[in-house]
């Protein structure tokens, strides 16, 4: 019995000092409150808090409708075939938006949006392929000179003919002028056909750019202000790659599955586009927690307190700044329209979804909303088509 008590006393926990070398103290991972809960509220009116989830849902619908606005007449001019409204609504040529992060105070709402502007990238790529490379060539400059010389000669001859006709037939001056205008417009259309389409693309880019300007956003801000009865501030973050946000990563798959049912093909294309780099596991810095180095004698004499060195330490200790793995899953009625097969499930992944520092290094990590991993972004989208309902899930892991 005494041996059991002695063994318990030896194995019981004993307090140790912070400066003890056997203790490993690591930086604690602090995650923003908005990542933990999708909206953070600091308000005193209890009755207003009950309606905030419904209001935020309507506001997100309004914001998505604003960024999905398009000019059907102008877009149809850039196509040979007729542009149908149904296919335009499910087109991937749009501005993709994530779920909003709402921060409520007593008199203001701060809305953070992550945006991937696919429409702008598409138009810039088309301009580069079709026009910008053409304009740089010497052949194009020679053609412009030829159009100028030939056009001036034709205009001079036509002007002389019109003067003769107006002198001989003064009653028919208006008819001569209309025929002359028709001739001019036909000549301009033939000679500057490519430049006309170039101007259409420039107009589309201007409309896309105007959606992010304050003058056009003011109308949206006024509508959101009427819903919340508060001042509204937008923080729009433009993402370089679409796989940096799980909501934006899953939206193209949902839109493509509404058109056609090539599930595996779309999954492979989206997963292939995600670029994942090899992660080098770095040791956590314990230098700031060693209290012996903060003596008044040696603190000012240290060379390691330079701004570049401190910046390097801070950036190396930042968490969740690199994508380490992605996964997509589609399930539901993914067969063709008139087939009698049942629901299907298809998955594709790339990289690793594990939290590398906690699973391999054994470092402590926080948990979101009770059971969600801090390094994972998870999204579920439910949608319907003519065949039936289907769902899309997306995971993005970061280190």
From Swiss-Prot:
MF terms in GO: structural constituent of ribosome
InterPro entries found in the cross-reference section: Ribosomal_uS3m_fun
Any GO BP annotation: translation
Subcellular location: Mitochondrion
GO CC term (a single one): mitochondrion
Keywords: Mitochondrion, Ribonucleoprotein, Ribosomal protein
Pfam families referenced in this protein's UniProt entry, alphabetically: VAR1 (PF05316)
Family according to the record: Belongs to the universal ribosomal protein uS3 family.
Reported function: Essential for mitochondrial protein synthesis and required for the maturation of small ribosomal subunits.
Official protein name in the record: Small ribosomal subunit protein uS3m
């Amino acid at each position: 019995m005494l041996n059991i008590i002695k063994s318990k006393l030896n194995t019981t926990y004993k307090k140790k000092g912070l400066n003890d070398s056997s203790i490993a103290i690591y930086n604690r991972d602090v995650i923003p409150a908005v990542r933990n809960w999708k909206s953070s509220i600091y308000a005193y009116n209890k009755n207003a808090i009950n309606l905030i989830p419904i209001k935020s849902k309507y506001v997100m619908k309004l914001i998505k409708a604003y960024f999905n606005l398009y000019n059907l007449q102008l877009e149809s001019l850039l196509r040979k075939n007729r542009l149908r409204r149904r296919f335009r609504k499910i087109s991937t040529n749009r501005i993709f938006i994530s779920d909003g992060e709402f921060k409520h105070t007593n008199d203001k709402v701060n809305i953070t949006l992550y945006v991937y502007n696919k429409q702008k990238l598409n138009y810039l790529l088309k301009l580069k392929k079709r026009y910008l490379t053409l304009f740089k060539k010497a052949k194009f400059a020679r053609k412009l000179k030829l159009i100028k010389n030939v056009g001036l000669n034709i205009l001079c001859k036509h002007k002389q003919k019109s003067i003769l006709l107006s002198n001989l037939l003064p009653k028919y001056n208006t008819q001569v002028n209309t025929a002359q205008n028709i001739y001019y417009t036909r000549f301009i259309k033939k000679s500057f056909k490519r430049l006309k389409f170039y101007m259409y693309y420039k107009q589309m880019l201007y409309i896309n750019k105007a959606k992010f300007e304050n003058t056009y956003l003011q109308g949206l801000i006024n509508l959101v202000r009427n819903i919340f009865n508060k001042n509204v501030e937008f923080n729009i973050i433009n993402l370089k790659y679409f796989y940096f946000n799980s909501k934006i990563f899953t939206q193209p798959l949902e839109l493509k599955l509404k058109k056609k049912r090539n599930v595996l093909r779309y999954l492979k294309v989206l997963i292939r586009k995600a670029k994942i780099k090899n992660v080098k596991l770095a040791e956590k810095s314990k230098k700031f927690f060693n209290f012996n180095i903060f003596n008044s004698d040696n603190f000012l004499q240290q060379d390691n307190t330079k701004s570049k060195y401190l910046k390097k330490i801070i950036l190396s200790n930042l968490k969740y700044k690199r994508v380490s793995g992605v996964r997509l899953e589609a399930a539901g009625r993914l067969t063709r329209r008139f087939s009698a097969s049942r629901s299907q499930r298809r998955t594709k992944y790339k990289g690793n979804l594990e939290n590398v520092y906690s699973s391999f290094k054994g470092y402590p990590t926080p948990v979101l909303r009770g059971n969600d991993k801090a390094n994972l972004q998870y999204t579920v989208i439910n949608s319907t088509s003519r065949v039936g309902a289907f769902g899309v899930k997306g995971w993005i892991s970061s280190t």
